Regions:
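Bacterial N-terminal signal peptides that target proteins for export
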Residues: 1-12
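A subset of signal/propeptide-processing and intrinsically disordered low-complexity segments
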Residues: 4, 23-25, 121
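SH3-family beta-barrel domains
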Residues: 27-57, 68-72, 79-94, 98-121, ...
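Second-shell loop/turn segments in exported
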Residues: 60-62
């Protein structure tokens, strides 16, 4: 009987310690953020899912439309979330709010730079050129490794160095 009482007392003490100290919640548990509605990283790149996207001054339909994008698959950067709304930035630095349903996780980028950009057959500077692009061409991103991204443009796949693309971060890797 004495062993059972000791066991119950020790169990109760351990229960109180775990409850009062917050054990089981994780030492680095992230607190709920009312501005975040997903667990995806912020900032992150996405693309427009529709050929007509209203950009508003705030996160809701009650806010006036600032402008309208008419380019499906245009890359944009999500810089803030509020409920179903996303604050985005485009390649020119323009910022506004769009409904999350008008965005897609499919990755696109835009070629940038002052010179002609070469799309190569392999992720190497000495690789055979496949295409030459001017700035402002939209490309589908398939994967990014180190300093290269595998892209598709005009039904041709190849590799472009990340520093010639807007729509991917310098250290970002994905496939």
């Amino acid at each position: 009987m004495r062993n059972i009482n000791s066991f119950i007392i020790i169990g109760f003490i351990l229960f109180m310690l775990f409850t009062l100290c917050g054990a089981g919640q994780g030492a680095y548990a992230e607190k709920a953020n009312p501005w975040r509605s997903t667990t995806y990283p912020i900032p992150r790149f996405v693309s427009l899912a529709s050929s007509e996207v209203n950009v508003r001054t705030g996160p809701g339909r009650k806010y006036p439309v600032k402008w309208v994008y008419r380019q499906k698959q245009m890359p944009v950067e999500i810089i803030l979330e509020f409920d179903a709304w996303r604050k985005i930035r485009d390649q020119d630095g323009a910022v506004g709010w769009v409904h999350g349903s008008l965005l897609s996780g499919r990755r696109f980028a835009v070629s940038q730079g002052e010179n002609v950009i070469t799309v190569t057959s392999k992720p190497r500077t000495d690789s055979k050129p496949k295409l030459k692009l001017e700035a402002g061409v939209r490309l589908r991103l398939h994967e990014c490794i180190h300093v290269w991204c595998k892209v598709e443009v005009a039904e041709t796949k190849g590799w472009v160095q990340k520093n010639f693309l807007w729509g991917v971060y310098p250290q970002e890797k994905f496939d």
